[in-house]
């Protein structure tokens, strides 16, 4: 089990790094370096100013992160600054012998989960540094023979912790130390509330999933909220106790260490968390209804993420970018009003329904609300994401 879990985590780390490896400047390129007491920041000449700003604040961020996590790495960390895909991202490689961070300079769009921030370099450094400081804590006992033979020296927390905890904790740190990011934006509470209202908060077994739209956001958004809930329930400093227990002589596996600190298995406490989040969402919905809040009419229920909605200048069409599944972005355009084809299809459905209901043993079939509507046009993305900031041209016939 340990070997399979470790292989998965190593594979996942390398998979995340693949775009950077393929698209970024190679080792033979022109590299420049800023050095600080704990970091080496490597960059191509075109990123010199961005790297200089990062170097100016990296030691103060280091001091805050190490104090918050409760551990300070002994090795200097290499930081690589690049922008291979013109999108917001970062990577952390928590190897015990040579930890490294990769920072992509393009900032996120405002409507994304991490779109609420004050300084992109600060929040990106805080999140990725949290990974390093959190995960390079070594064992406080000698390594086993098999662990000494491992080609990738990883600490006990990296080997034992599930993905939701790894990403959730870095997300928690990014918010706690910057006052921005996912914990302070509107996207995270919106997702938690919507999932709660629909009874779709992921089960514990799916919390670390990498498949589906929820798999892309759940470890960050739901995982960080669960960790905040755990520490509020158990008391300040309880998460630091968990990290120490995982690296201790009697640490055991993750479930055993978690139970030693919080008193119950993670699955049981997560079920309690889900119940509370659902109850809070329903109570808030009822409160807003009593206050007379009108949310508007639901037009479509779509799988995955939908962003950048924009009505055409003539008011006849709706443009939006869609990410129905991770790395499956597209642009979609709908007719706002019901089309003649849709009207005929609805008439045929009603005629079939009326004919069936002539049989007294049949019961009427309630149609889906809102009725699903297919886009008039779609344009798949040619890369791993969706086009950024699509908008109508003035003629209302073309999209930029």
Task: List the model feature ranges, each with a label.
Residues 9-23:
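Bacterial N-terminal signal peptides
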Residues 24-162, 209-212, 253, 257:
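Juxtacatalytic substrate-recognition/specificity segment
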Residues 129-145, 169-187:
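Catalytic Zn2+-binding segment of zinc metalloproteases
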Residues 326-335:
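Structural motif
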Residues 323:
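Short loop/turn segments immediately following the C-termini of beta-strands
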Residues 154, 161, 184-284:
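Amphipathic alpha-helical substructures
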Residues 283-305, 334-391:
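Multi-bladed beta-propeller domains
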Residues 309-317, 389-398:
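Blade-terminus and WD-like Trp-Asp/Gly-His loop motifs, strongest in beta-propeller folds
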């Amino acid at each position: 089990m340990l070997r399979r879990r470790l292989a998965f985590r190593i594979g996942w780390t390398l998979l995340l790094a693949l775009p950077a490896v393929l698209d970024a400047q190679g080792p033979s390129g022109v590299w420049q370096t800023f050095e600080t007491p704990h970091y080496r920041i490597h960059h191509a000449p075109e990123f010199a100013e961005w790297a200089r700003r990062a170097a100016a604040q990296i030691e103060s961020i280091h001091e805050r992160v190490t104090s918050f996590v409760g551990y300070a790495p002994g090795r200097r960390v290499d930081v690589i600054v690049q922008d291979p895909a013109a999108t917001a991202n970062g990577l952390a490689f928590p190897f015990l012998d040579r930890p490294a961070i990769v920072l992509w300079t393009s900032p996120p769009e405002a409507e994304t989960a991490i779109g609420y921030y004050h300084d992109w370099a600060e929040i990106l450094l805080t999140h990725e540094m949290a990974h390093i400081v959190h995960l390079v804590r070594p064992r406080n006992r000698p390594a086993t023979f098999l662990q000494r033979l491992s080609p990738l020296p990883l600490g006990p927390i990296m080997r034992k912790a599930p993905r939701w905890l790894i990403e959730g904790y870095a997300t928690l740190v990014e918010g706690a130390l910057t006052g921005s990011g996912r914990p302070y934006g509107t996207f995270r509470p919106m997702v938690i509330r919507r999932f709660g209202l629909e009874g779709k908060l992921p089960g514990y077994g799916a919390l670390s999933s990498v498949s589906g739209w929820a798999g892309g956001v759940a470890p960050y958004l739901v995982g960080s909220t669960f960790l905040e809930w755990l520490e509020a329930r158990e008391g300040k400093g309880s998460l630091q106790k968990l990290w120490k227990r995982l690296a201790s002589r009697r640490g055991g596996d993750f479930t055993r260490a978690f139970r030693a600190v919080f008193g119950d298995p993670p699955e049981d406490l997560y079920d309690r968390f889900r119940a509370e989040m659902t109850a809070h969402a329903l109570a808030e919905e009822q409160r807003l209804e009593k206050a007379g809040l009108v949310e508007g009419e639901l037009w479509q229920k779509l799988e995955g993420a939908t962003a950048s909605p924009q009505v055409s200048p003539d008011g006849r069409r709706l443009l939006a970018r869609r990410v129905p599944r991770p790395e499956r972005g597209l642009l979609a355009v709908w007719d706002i009003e019901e089309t003649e084809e849709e009207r005929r299809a609805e008439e045929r459905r009603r005629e079939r329904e009326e004919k069936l209901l002539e049989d007294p043993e049949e019961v009427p079939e309630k149609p889906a609300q809102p009725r699903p509507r297919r886009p008039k046009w779609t344009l798949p993305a040619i890369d791993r994401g969706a086009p950024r900031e699509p908008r109508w041209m003035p003629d209302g016939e073309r999209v930029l």
